[in-house]
Every structure is written in C-alpha cells, then in structure tokens.
C-alpha cells in the first residue's frame, strides 16, 4: 500500500532531510511525529552521545524514539567538515537544516561584541560551504535565525551570497508551528538544558545559484 505524503511547514515526508546542530533532538522528533516516520531523516549533533545525556534531560529519550521511527542518528558531526564525513558524504539531501546556529557559550551575554559576531558568521559560513556540496540539484539549505539586533548583524543573506547561494525565500518562523520543539541553550555549562525564547526570527531558504 502506498504511503501518503505528509507535510509540516516546509518539510515533506518524501524529502531526504539532514538536520545539523541538534541539541535535545526535539526538532527532529517533531518532524518524525508529523510524518509518522523518520526513514528519510538524518539527525546530527556536534556533541557525543554521552555529552548529550549530561546536557539535556530528554535527549536520550528523544533519540530512542527517533530510532524507533527509523531515524539515522549521527553524533560528533562538525558542520565545518561534514561534507567529508564518511557517514554523510555519499548522500545528497533535499533539505539541510540548521536551526539557531551559535558559536558557543563563551559568547553568551556578549553578543554585541565584534568577536562574537565574527565567530558566529564563521560558523554559518562553514556550514553553508559544506552544505552546498551535499544538496540534491533542486535542494534547499535552511537556516532559522533571530532577526533582531545584534543577530541581524550576522548578515545571513550576505553569507549565503558569498557561498554562491541564492536566497529563495525568507519565511517568518513560529515556534507554535512545530509542536514539541523546545529550543535549548546547549552552552555546555549548568544552563545547557535551559529554554531560550526565540523572539522575532525567520527561516532563510537558500538554493544553488
């Protein structure tokens, strides 16, 4: 029996989806729950599995549910080098998604500094450089990011253009559109599991030029 296609916002159950920088894996689980399957989802974290279990109370439970849905879970995936990762490099994806990229806890409370902004931009630039090598011909790279100052100074659209990508669309992001998705600080300290408010933010959708 043919399984019907299911959608949640910009994502279809038929898309081959790569999620990077997952914290507690709640966004991955949101998509899997909406689709009723995660057979087409690869969800990755920079952290090791042990680090995740320390940082987030619900990460291990979320990962176990995702595995039952058929999700491919990968740990210690660096967005700066992921296009060379043996477990990912042979794949091509319809959607590559990085939600709320951040260069790390050393910049919490210092987002106004030029050093922080440049470090964040370098993270996004490295992600885009690798992600564009992993796209299907008509695939899209999605970055969800705060649009208020100082986050607006990252210049997401300009960073995409610098990597030879075209901004297809900029769509307002509403957390309520993704049931079960809980944004976490993920700083590596005692506040890793704390929720952070998303405020005004958008999803930037890039394609190959």
From Swiss-Prot:
InterPro entries: BMT5-like, SAM-dependent_MTases_sf
SUPFAM superfamilies assigned to the protein according to its UniProt record, in alphabetical order: S-adenosyl-L-methionine-dependent methyltransferases
Ranges annotated as spanning the membrane: none
GO terms of molecular function: rRNA (uridine-N3-)-methyltransferase activity
UniProt GO BP: rRNA base methylation
Domain of life the protein comes from: Eukaryota
The name this protein goes by in its record: Uncharacterized protein At4g26485
UniProt source species: Arabidopsis thaliana (Mouse-ear cress)
Lineage: Eukaryota, Viridiplantae, Streptophyta, Embryophyta, Tracheophyta
